[in-house]
Amino acid sequence: MGKKRIVFFAYLPFFTIFMSFSFAGITKESPFSIGQTLSSSNGVYELGFFSLNNSQNQYLGIWFKSIIPQVVVWVANREKPVTDSAANLGISSNGSLLLSNGKHGVVWSTGDIFASNGSRAELTDHGNLVFIDKVSGRTLWQSFEHLGNTLLPTSIMMYNLVAGEKRGLTAWKSYTDPSPGEFVALITPQVPSQGIIMRGSTRYYRTGPWAKTRFTGSPQMDESYTSPFILTQDVNGSGYFSFVERGKPSRMILTSEGTMKVLVHNGMDWESTYEGPANSCDIYGVCGPFGLCVVSIPPKCKCFKGFVPKFAKEWKKGNWTSGCVRRTELHCQGNSSGKDANVFYTVPNIKPPDFYEYANSQNAEECHQNCLHNCSCLAFSYIPGIGCLMWSKDLMDTRQFSAAGELLSIRLARSELDVNKRKMTIVASTVSLTLFVIFGFAAFGFWRCRVEHNAHISNDAWRNFLQSQDVPGLEFFEMNAIQTATNNFSLSNKLGPGGFGSVYKARNGKLQDGREIAVKRLSSSSGQGKQEFMNEIVLISKLQHRNLVRVLGCCVEGTEKLLIYGFLKNKSLDTFVFDARKKLELDWPKRFEIIEGIARGLLYLHRDSRLRVIHRDLKVSNILLDEKMNPKISDFGLARMFQGTQYQEKTRRVVGTLGYMSPEYAWTGVFSEKSDIYSFGVLLLEIISGKKISSFSYGEEGKALLAYAWECWCETREVNFLDQALADSSHPSEVGRCVQIGLLCVQHEPADRPNTLELLSMLTTTSDLPLPKKPTFVVHTRKDESPSNDSMITVNEMTESVIQGR
């Protein structure tokens, strides 16, 4: 297979060092050495020796031949690298493939196979290294039966209960160490099967049961999702899982952080079509037994109806792993219909809990009846593509999606529903009495409302509009009250500029009712219209997280549009980081806490909120600080919501702040989660250095901030990049790690940047980091230039560019 072997004896030493041979196959007479490669006949895959992180250690592996950077999909000697340049792969006297480390012995082999003379090893068009017996033609050994961290199309994960065999993926220890890590991916022998990721001996993530074409625990696998997966089970106790290639190079990988990804190459980058776990609710058992994880509504863990926290104090602290217990014990008597009879309460949009049992039922009603008459059945679900599932154990690892998901019916004591009926009766009586009193004042109120109608018509119109947008609890403030509180927007009450306007504080920071507020007054010349104003109100009202700013309400009178926030005494992060005196208040531990807090807020926006929001204007001045210096992401006027499986969008109107905008967004209008990651990388480097991206200049060449960060990292001089005010409070290795994370975030290609879950993992663990590529998109303003000189860029003929200077 492949090209003929090149034999050119006079120059053999030169080519062994400086270029690779194309190799046809491995036989006993022609062993395979460092510097040689073996290609599949279709030219897609290649076998050879490679090193990681410029190390002297060599590994024998398979990779995509024409894709740069190199993507390794299988490693033979992942636990024991070779270090001798004389290392080779050959066929031993007993007929097995073995990898020897020169004079240092054997480091890897296929084991005793006893192949006949003339047998050979080849690389198939599917990326499978096979060892074929010449006489029988049988495949004696193949790499597809010894998986690493990657599943290729036509390779298989499987289990066989009779033979006691199971085959799954094992993550690398780190990006630069292919030895087995702590995560393993398997398919379970349950009926129906499901995929699980194990972290050591404990479950870390599961896909939910398989329903013919999809995993029920993945909301992105809705009816519109074209599943690449195939999972089959037979009556002999075996199961097989694989995925199909749809015309483009693809792979499924278990990362060293424990994330399963399906990646497809589009000719330029690897695009992710599936990821799990995708957010914090996907982590196994996060809410404990009978706990329900609802990622979009904090706190994310709740108890099912009829259940209460097992340990209330711990639950309030956010320690949910102990789960919930029944408020009313069951008194099951099979088919009882009396006052002690059990009932079922149905919850929609559910990821089916773990430890399910398949029950043979023809339809949902039969499934219901079978569970009702079985006292050990605690819940049931009838799922298209599966049928009837029942649960007799604790409901574990259950979450609720904002859309998609299954119906789960939970057995409760009838009294649990009767309590609600009594409450409804009391509420109805109270409402009736209240309405009677209200109508008694209606005549007087009608006259007064007519008098004030004109003054409030604008607010009422906006109130109606906002109510139609499902924005609950939003307060509408009177213009007179705001003008009085801010001394008619006097300069003495001005806190500073904000996105699309100025921000003011109330006198003494308070309204007459004692509340501390800040008022964002939108400028009529700012370019922010109804859409951006609505964006900010709707998004901030629906998003609730400790690292996001909280909006109290709004006020609209004529041309005036005001947003009312809770007042944060420490203003924005830039007033500390870039101020020679105030920066001393933020030592390195505090800055790192701020960095981590921003990342957690970003994770909520991208993965944990039901809206899935891309901020598009993440920068230091848009990070507010409360009295304890906790960061709050603000200014959502430019934010966009993503739906379903959408991962990117393209706009004709590129808006944002120069220097923080990713290359693909600035020049083509394409934005995604990775655009915010780029902005975070710039923000991170600014926090570390105490320097502005828009005005920093270093050396005679006038290097910009990203270029200087790259230079310091390459020369392991990260301490030079650090703000000197942090010299005594920082640790060099921690600073170096953060600089490297920042550089990973600002890589030119979106596919090279970490996603938000990976970013937070990098910040909160000490696992090895991948090596960043040199940033190629560098915006720089010389000190003798006004920032506005660089504030306008042309994206394309169809794009209106509105770039806001900091």
Curated annotation (Swiss-Prot):
Regions that span the bilayer: 426-446
CaM-binding as annotated region, ranges: 581-598
The record's top EC class is transferase
> Which cysteines does the record link by disulfide bonds?
C281-C293, C287-C301, C367-C388, C371-C377
InterPro entries given in the database record: Bulb-type_lectin_dom, Bulb-type_lectin_dom_sf, Kinase-like_dom_sf, Pan_app, Prot_kinase_dom, S-locus_recpt_kinase_C, S_locus_glycoprot_dom, Ser-Thr/Tyr_kinase_cat_dom
Ranges for the Bulb-type lectin domain? Answer: 25-144
The Gene Ontology biological process terms listed for this entry are: recognition of pollen
> What GO molecular functions are on record for this protein?
ATP binding; calmodulin binding; carbohydrate binding; protein serine kinase activity; protein serine/threonine kinase activity; ubiquitin protein ligase binding
What keywords are assigned to this protein?
Answer: ATP-binding, Cell membrane, Disulfide bond, EGF-like domain, Glycoprotein, Kinase, Lectin, Membrane, Nucleotide-binding, Phosphoprotein, Receptor, Serine/threonine-protein kinase, Signal, Transferase, Transmembrane, Transmembrane helix
Put simply, this protein is called G-type lectin S-receptor-like serine/threonine-protein kinase At1g61430
Q: What organism, scientifically named, is this protein from?
A: Arabidopsis thaliana
Source organism phylogeny? Eukaryota, Viridiplantae, Streptophyta, Embryophyta, Tracheophyta
